[in-house]
Amino acid sequence: MNGNRFGRLFEVTTYGESHGPGMGVVVSGCPAGVALDERMIQDELDRRKPGQSMITTSRGEPDEVSIQSGLQDGYTTGTPIGMTIENKDAESGKYEPFVTAPRPSHGDYTYSAKFGTRNWGGGGRSSARETVNWVAAGAVAKAVLAQSDHDVRVKAHVNQIGEIEAPDVSFEDIREHSEDNEVRCADPETAERMRALIDDYQERGDSIGGSIYFEARGVPRGLGAPRFDSVPARLGQALFAIPATTSVEFGLGRDARSVAGKQRNEDWTVADGDEDHVVADEGDPIPAGNDHGGLQGGITTGEPIYGEASWHAPTSIPKTQATVDWETGEEKAVTVTGRHDPSLPPRAVPVVEAMLYCTILDFMLLGGRINPDRLDGHPGQYDTDYHPSSPRNE
């Protein structure tokens, strides 16, 4: 099975299955000299782990990370960083009815059709359990960016559950209030309504979808390459990799289809050097607005990158549904029991942030904004052929 690696210079390779012994991730391309310890990784994993509240799965995984390599005396060495997380509360017995009878709207049959076999416990490799690895990698990327000369900050919050939509909130409000409630919505009144809606679906044995607003600030202009390595193309790939993602938008997103060109086009103006929302020096040209979401021509403008990603309702629900045993051809009525989330966005917030951190850092390394060998080394201008020469360190 391929497709277990992403990133060009900051390369993340993951392994593990939902009900296997554990999960693991290897991060290659992290510069040497970054202060890093297990607590920094654990803080992010604790935001994603199951069993946080009544609106998450009750699976009791502590998600304790163990760093196996890549550190010396609390600093990265530039060698691969290996991290493992044990699975301690798997219950595979409830999945035995689906060994040859696929659960509706899961990857059970498609995996079996492709590979001729699969690990059926908990969905195996197709489970969202896999995202624990991504959050661990994202914590490493976050540490690199925080200790670099660039003030890159990424935040996200749940902005819609079902038909309940939060009003627009500021980046500062998201930073300060997105963790104030179990839904991870930065608007407290909306969060209460969202929580009640999730509870209602859960009590009825059903589930509900939603969306997450994300924003990255401090990203310098000029990152990305045309076409297939554009920033929106790579960010879109990273976010669509999250299980159950149905759409990803930047800037105006789908609303742009009903906006005239003159209205959406943004005039250019001159930076006065005091803007706190854009990376620009005094006298630099900057867009007068940001309906493009910090991206023009697939390349960063220095303005905030923002957008929205949506998820469908979780497919594991205790409702009677129809399936077919692919060995016997028998039609069956099945009920998916077990422990599952009634709505995905509350736990997906740290996953979204992690994928943005990983992808943005990769672009920063490719674009020569951060030395790929050592954090205290001189940046340089590299080609985007993924094999840059090391810069001179004087």
UniProtKB/Swiss-Prot annotation:
Its cofactor is FMNH2. Its EC number is 4.2.3.5. It catalyses: 5-O-(1-carboxyvinyl)-3-phosphoshikimate = chorismate + phosphate. Reduced FMN (FMNH(2)). Gene3D superfamilies: Chorismate synthase AroC. One of its GO terms (biological process) is aromatic amino acid family biosynthetic process. This is Chorismate synthase. It comes from Halobacterium salinarum (strain ATCC 700922 / JCM 11081 / NRC-1). The gene is aroC.
